[in-house]
Amino acid sequence: MGVSRVLHVEGGTPLKGELRVYPAKNAALPILAASLLTPEPITLVEVPRLRDVEVMLELLAHLGTQYAWEGRTLHLQTPEIKSTHAPYELVGQMRASFIVWGALLARAGEGHVSMPGGCAFGFRPVDQHIKALEALGAEVWEEDGTFHARRTRPLSGRVVFDLPTVGGTEQAMLAVALGGEATLVQAAVEPEVVDLGHFLALLGAEVEGLGSPIVRIKGAPRLKGGTYRIIPDRIEAGTYLLAAAATRGSLTLEGVRPDHLDALLDKLWRSGHRLEVGEDWIRFRATPDPAPFHVEAREYPGFPTDLQPIATAYLATVPGQSTVVDRIYPDRFTHVGELARMGAELYLRDRILTVQGRRLHGAQVKALDIRAGGALVVAALSAEGASEIEGVYFLERGYEHLTERLQALGARVHLRESPVALAAD
């Protein structure tokens, strides 16, 4: 017999208290990749201590980066690129690590990156990454599951994306930041993309149009170092707000960017909850009788796809009928079957999820990706009775100190070890 960890949740207790939002993982990862662009020292203040960040640091160390933690501050320096190959054993763990491709191409003139891995929901191609690098003048090819790129001059050109793409936009920005120049059309406008642009500007690149569909970037022949603070995590903040809503609790978030959460805050307000918003704080008080609503996940500033599963879990507790559509990842519904085990009434047809809210009950469930895991936690917190959530690995990729933070809000949760039968030889 082997042993795995499960999250044990005794549901039915409203979450109450205050919470400071951690920095955004989805902003930290491309900024970490951007550290490859300069030989100068970089200091990142308040970096999330998550498994995905550790994987990215392992990859950067393989490529030549030296780093050291000082509390939650991270010091990095890449005097030289020691390898231009990002191996499968690291890239296969996390899709975001694919972003080092553009940075390697800019700094070393070539980059070789294995097919990305990470959360297995829907079809998430890298065609827009390839299109961008080719439009900028790189030679790109794929062989045996590895993507290769090479350049003979600084990359420059005009990239017209087929659709807004966060990863593709970030890849192109990194590829031209060191001596190149580009105009990106249909660029992603997400806060994490804007944060990367601000970081590149700190290093010496000229970036215009951040937060708009047309971004212009002019790289510098040599980038400098600097100190940077990463934006707060809007997905973590949204998860805790939805957990407070599902448990009919109250919550104050500090160190948050409310303007990054407009779509969610509007839904919660329309659902009947009370909200007060300041420059960097949100006060939330749940109504005991919330109303259902329609969720349509879209590109920013629309409703975030990463909050769609968590919102689904909340709506499963709201009397009445709600509907959920994901325009980013239309098949992002790995959480539906597990929520059904807790008594949720969910009907998926033609990629439209209909949710009939009711009181949930505890069950043994399994997280199949990061945000599906967040959805199960929210459902379990609101449910009657005990739940056990397998797949703690996914939760630890997306939520720092989740158990301790929920306990601080009054939740009855703890991690425990569970025996697992091992496969026979």
Curated annotation (Swiss-Prot):
Enzymatic reactions: phosphoenolpyruvate + UDP-N-acetyl-alpha-D-glucosamine = UDP-N-acetyl-3-O-(1-carboxyvinyl)-alpha-D-glucosamine + phosphate
UniProt main location, coarse: cytoplasm
Listed NCBIfam families: murA (TIGR01072), PRK09369.1 (NF006873)
Active site per the UniProt annotation: C119
InterPro entries, sorted: Enolpyruvate_Tfrase_dom (IPR001986), Enolpyruvate_Tfrase_sf (IPR036968), MurA_subfamily (IPR050068), RNA3'P_cycl/enolpyr_Trfase_a/b (IPR013792), UDP_GlcNAc_COvinyl_MurA (IPR005750)
GO biological process annotation, one example: cell wall organization
Entry's localization field: Cytoplasm
Gene: murA
Keyword Transferase in annotation: yes
Binding site for UDP-N-acetyl-alpha-D-glucosamine: R95, R124, P125, V126, D127, Q128, D306, I328
Function: Cell wall formation. Adds enolpyruvyl to UDP-N-acetylglucosamine.
Protein name in the entry: UDP-N-acetylglucosamine 1-carboxyvinyltransferase
Protein family (similarity comment): Belongs to the EPSP synthase family. MurA subfamily.
Enzyme Commission no: 2.5.1.7
Chain positions recorded as phosphoenolpyruvate binding sites: K25, N26
Known pathway: Cell wall biogenesis; peptidoglycan biosynthesis
PANTHER family (UniProt xref): UDP-N-ACETYLGLUCOSAMINE 1-CARBOXYVINYLTRANSFERASE
Entry GO CC: cytoplasm
One protein family per Pfam: EPSP_synthase
GO terms for MF: UDP-N-acetylglucosamine 1-carboxyvinyltransferase activity
Keyword Cell cycle: yes
